[in-house]
């Protein structure tokens, strides 16, 4: 039996953002599996370099484009290496907020 109807119902319940996140994650996983860690590491460095250049030039269009490329690479590495950055991000943001509060009290 075809699960097409069930798939269609699931897609209808998702928001466009959720749908795109799921589709992007699946494509990212396939890219990682095809090219592998070594090739994607080189690609990641290339994309980071392009973002740095765009930032230095203050080119808004290029910054947006290169940020998307870097986010794709981050997604692939998080999936491929099973990395969860959420708790570390929370720690670092809390540390920064504490610094801000400390600076305000001076």
Task: Identify the residue ranges that each predicted region occupies.
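Flexible "arm" and connector segments at domain edges
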Residues: 2-106
């Amino acid at each position: 039996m075809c699960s097409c109807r069930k798939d269609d119902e699931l897609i209808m319940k998702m928001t466009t953002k959720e749908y795109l996140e799921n589709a992007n994650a699946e494509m990212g996983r396939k890219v990682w599996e095809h090219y592998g860690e070594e090739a994607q590491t080189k690609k990641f460095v290339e994309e980071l370099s392009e973002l740095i250049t765009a930032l230095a030039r203050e080119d808004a269009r290029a910054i947006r484009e290169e940020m998307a490329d870097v986010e794709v690479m981050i997604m692939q590495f998080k999936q491929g290496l099973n990395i969860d950055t959420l708790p570390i991000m929370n720690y670092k943001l809390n540390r920064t907020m504490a610094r801000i509060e400390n600076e305000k009290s001076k």
